[in-house]
Amino acid sequence: MNEPLKPRVTFDDASPQEPLPQLRAGLAFDEQSGTPFSPISREEEVPEEGAAEEAISAALRPKRSLWRRMVMAGIGLFGVSALAQGVQSLHNAWIQQDWIALGGITAGSLIVAAGVGSLVVEWRRLYRLRERAEERDVARDLLHSHGVGRGREFCEKLARQAGLDSGHPAIQRWQASLHETHNDREVLELYARLVQPVLDTQARREISRSAAESTLMIAVSPLALVDMAFIAWRNLRLINRIAALYGIELGYFSRIRLFRLVLINIAFAGASELVREIGMDWMSQDLAARLSTRAAQGIGAGLLTARLGIKAMELCRPLPWLDDKPRLGDFRRELIGQVKETLQKGR
């Protein structure tokens, strides 16, 4: 029953030895030999969505050149000379009792005064638009502040600018939610959640309406000139209405400042007509294909109008976006649904 014992087996210790890692000589770094670098914050990065807007703004921004300064200096010198000549002519006409010349000089002075007054009004409106950017910076600081007292005064100022009195339901809900223990950040967050959406909803409604009208107009328009004129008119009207909603009265220069992105929209409308005509000759003369191509071009124009409206909201809105920034995809779904419904009714 007992099994015999197996003989002993002796193994040689011939396992390979792992080579020890070789240590490299130490390196000492100092400030002189090192390469200087500076960290890049995420705020400095330009998002892909706003790359086109940044490029157009940089292209349209006037360059501070020597020729520009010389022209401005010449215009200023000419204005001073004309004013001095007018005063001298007025004095001579009064002494010589030349009533006809005196009347002409007086009429010219009134016209010049009206022009200067218009320039002052335009400057004030442009300054109001720039002041809105400063208010956004103040609001951004208050959203990171733990102080007390500044937030409520700032929000009441924004409500007055937007034309919301103390009897408005949104203002009443906001005031009822306030507590004396709330700091500036909490007061501003309550305003952004209870009052600001009232204006944002109206602005979104205006954007949706203008985008839908642009889509349907481009879809049925046979002429590129009509497309361009209609889009320009609709976008001007959209900018004016959005600015008025947020309490900003636009002048000539401030309207141009907000209307820069319309250049993309107009250029797209003119080019889309050419692409559509070439595509029609290349594809077919079928009616269904023609309608689908026109609808696609209309959706593209409507999306660009919606993007212009979103940009106008960003420039006119007194508060920075928290988590409620409108997306282009929301308007895209609405436009596609409206175009599909229109095509089905047409059949």
UniProtKB/Swiss-Prot annotation:
Subcellular compartments: Cell inner membrane
Comp. bias regions, Basic and acidic residues: 1-11
Keyword Membrane: yes
Transmembrane segments: 70-90, 100-120, 213-233
Membrane topology: Multi-pass membrane protein
Family matches, as Pfam families: DUF697
The entry's keywords: Cell inner membrane, Cell membrane, Membrane, Transmembrane, Transmembrane helix
Keyword Thylakoid tagged: no
InterPro entries referenced in this protein's UniProt entry, alphabetically: DUF697, UPF0283
Family, per entry: Belongs to the UPF0283 family.
The protein, known as: UPF0283 membrane protein PC1_2326
